[in-house]
């Protein structure tokens, strides 16, 4: 995340494919401006790929093309909520007060009118790639709106330096125009201001209800759609009103993909939002406007034509409606043993990260029961993006990478790969990389000591994937990484998931089933003639009643059971292990039998 480049990723696509993954979610690629970092969350030029990520023969376009050549997809993290503290090039960039006196000459670089910041090129006068000479002025700029320009604040820095008004970007100083940026700090994370104020001083909050801002962002992300990315992860989605997503940004994505690649491509362009509700419950402290599932739905009434007014009207209306009056759906659920065509008519166009499962992944059983408790409130929970930890947090908003142990990781994976939703893994978890390490500690410690450390050393060597989950050759350190117990577990889980359509796309039910983490899944598609029905239990035993009679074969062991009375009992396979009994329906829907070879957990 904070090191490496596209060339390294291109070179290791076979490692990712060899684990069995078919898609890669990468952090933002836009030109970042924030001293040393280039993670893209401090976007400065949204129309330019950060050159620190590119090299000869390894542009962003090269990465997209290379992934597609291997049958893999690229999901790009994108940000509509904010820019860097230095604004957004082409929209607005603030000018701060600066003075190259005895105290501050080290900080303020001399202006070089012939130099343009790109994050990579070293500016010759300062000797810095993070040159800031274009960002400050001692003379008050024309049209300045920052209050008290250049006057002493009466405060000093920790070093004892005099601090001046307008010396750094701030939402409340008047430095940012109200038309383009919000001018306040968030005071209540479950209040209206969480959608219309700054999160952090490094994240200048766009006025996303302004047409100029909307057009700037839509134009920028059209560029990456044109390059062929396969989907977007929407960062900080909760901090933008749902009306703005539903009116402007989500339709713009669909319109552009359709225009460039056709309606089928638009239907398959996967969009998922980060609605960061850090609670263990179904709704975020009772606030529907701040809950993940809320963003998967279209609006259910008309609001003012003006986007800013509409955002407030929608907020008030939905808060008054409360949690009990929100729409519900059975799109994720079987009707008895039958799959039914999902009703997509009320879908907003945004799927979401499953924050409730993420928060409750202290153990798999807890995540499972909390997850299914929320599923009727999503438009379609089978599209939820499910993970244990990420570049931001571990379960229960832990500041550390998951440290539950190898057996617990195996159990978590067995659940994620067979339950509804799209299983997602943060890099390195296949070897419990940096377990227990603090994910982020800002500039106070080396990145190598954090959960965001560089993983490339574990991938040194050569690897060739013959198919998803299949490695034909590996040498060097990467061979050791692939031999790790959880890496092998992942490979087989991915093999099984790919071979059983019900696990990939099916609806589920726990009706008539006894067992802690046990469920049945089915997917049917008349056009292709697909019908896939599977009984799943994770770690513990289960009894299934009221199921179709017939022959069932376990994809893990190859064991076959004939059901004649609608009941099947499965003994407990053990922690992290799994049973997937697939109904043999003959022909193209025949049970695949045992898939893969026994490993440390699936046996």
Language model features with spans:
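Conserved residues at the C-terminal ends of beta-strands
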Residues: 27, 49, 235, 240, ...
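Extracellular and analogous surface-interaction loops
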Residues: 13-14, 526
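Active-site neighborhood of divalent metal-dependent phosphoester/pyrophosphate hydrolases
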Residues: 388-395
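Surface-exposed cleft-lining segments at the edges of enzyme active sites
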Residues: 395-401
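A generic structural-conservation signal
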Residues: 25, 76, 233, 425-426
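Short acidic/polar active-site loop segments enriched in Thr and Asp
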Residues: 22, 230, 423
């Amino acid at each position: 995340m904070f090191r490496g480049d596209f060339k390294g990723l291109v070179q290791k696509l076979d490692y990712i494919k060899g684990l069995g993954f078919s898609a890669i979610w990468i952090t933002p690629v836009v030109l970042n401006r924030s001293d040393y970092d280039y993670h893209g969350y401090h976007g400065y030029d949204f129309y330019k790929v950060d050159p620190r990520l590119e090299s000869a023969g390894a542009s962003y376009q090269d990465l997209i093309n290379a992934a597609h050549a291997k049958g893999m997809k690229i999901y790009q993290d994108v940000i509509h909520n904010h820019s860097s503290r230095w604004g957004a090039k082409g929209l607005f960039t603030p000018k701060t007060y600066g003075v190259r006196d005895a105290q501050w000459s080290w900080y303020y670089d001399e202006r070089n009118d012939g130099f343009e910041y790109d994050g990579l090129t070293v500016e010759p006068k300062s000797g810095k790639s993070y040159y800031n000479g274009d960002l400050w002025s001692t003379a008050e700029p024309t049209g300045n709106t920052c209050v008290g320009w250049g006057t002493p604040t009466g405060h000093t820095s920790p070093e004892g330096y005099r601090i001046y008004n307008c010396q750094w970007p701030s939402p409340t100083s008047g430095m940012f125009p109200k038309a383009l940026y919000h001018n306040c700090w968030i005071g209540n994370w479950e209040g209206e201001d969480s959608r219309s104020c700054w999160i952090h001083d490094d994240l200048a909050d766009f006025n996303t209800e302004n047409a100029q801002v909307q057009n700037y962002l839509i134009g920028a992300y059209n560029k990456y759609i044109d390059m062929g990315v396969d989907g977007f992860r929407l960062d900080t989605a909760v901090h933008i009103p749902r009306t703005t997503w539903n009116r402007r940004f989500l339709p713009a994505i669909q319109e552009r993909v359709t225009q460039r690649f056709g309606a089928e491509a638009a239907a398959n362009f996967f969009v998922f939002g980060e609605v960061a509700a850090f609670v263990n419950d179904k709704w975020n402290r009772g606030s529907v406007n701040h809950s993940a599932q809320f963003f998967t739905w279209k609006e259910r009434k008309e609001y003012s034509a003006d986007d800013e007014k509409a955002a407030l009207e929608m907020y008030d209306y939905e808060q008054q409606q409360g949690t009990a009056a929100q729409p519900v759906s059975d799109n994720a659920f079987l009707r008895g043993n039958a799959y039914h065509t999902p009703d997509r008519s009320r879908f907003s166009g945004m799927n979401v990260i499953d924050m409730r499962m993420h928060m409750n992944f202290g153990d798999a059983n807890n995540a499972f029961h909390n997850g299914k408790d929320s599923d009727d409130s999503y438009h379609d929970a089978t599209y939820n993006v499910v993970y244990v930890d990420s570049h931001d947090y571990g379960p229960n908003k832990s500041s550390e990478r998951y440290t539950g142990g190898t057996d617990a990781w195996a159990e978590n994976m067995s659940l994620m790969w067979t339950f509804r939703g799209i299983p997602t893994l943060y890099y390195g978890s296949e070897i419990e990389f940096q377990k227990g390490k603090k994910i982020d500690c800002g500039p106070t410690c080396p990145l190598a000591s954090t959960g965001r450390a560089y993983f490339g050393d574990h991938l040194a060597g050569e690897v060739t994937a013959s198919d998803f989950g299949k490695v034909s050759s590996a040498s060097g350190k990467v061979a050791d990484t692939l031999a790790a117990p959880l890496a092998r577990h992942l490979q087989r889980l991915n093999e099984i998931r790919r071979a059983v359509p019900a696990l990939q796309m099916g609806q589920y039910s726990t009706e008539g089933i006894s067992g802690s983490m046990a469920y049945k899944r089915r997917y049917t598609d008349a056009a292709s003639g697909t019908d896939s029905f599977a009984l799943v239990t994770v770690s513990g035993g289960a009894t299934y009643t009221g199921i179709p009679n017939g022959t069932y074969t376990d994809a893990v062991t190859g064991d076959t059971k004939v059901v004649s009375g609608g009941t099947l009992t499965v003994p407990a396979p053990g922690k992290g292990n799994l049973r997937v009994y697939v109904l043999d329906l003959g022909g193209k829907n025949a049970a695949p039998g045992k898939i893969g070879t026994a490993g440390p957990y699936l046996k």
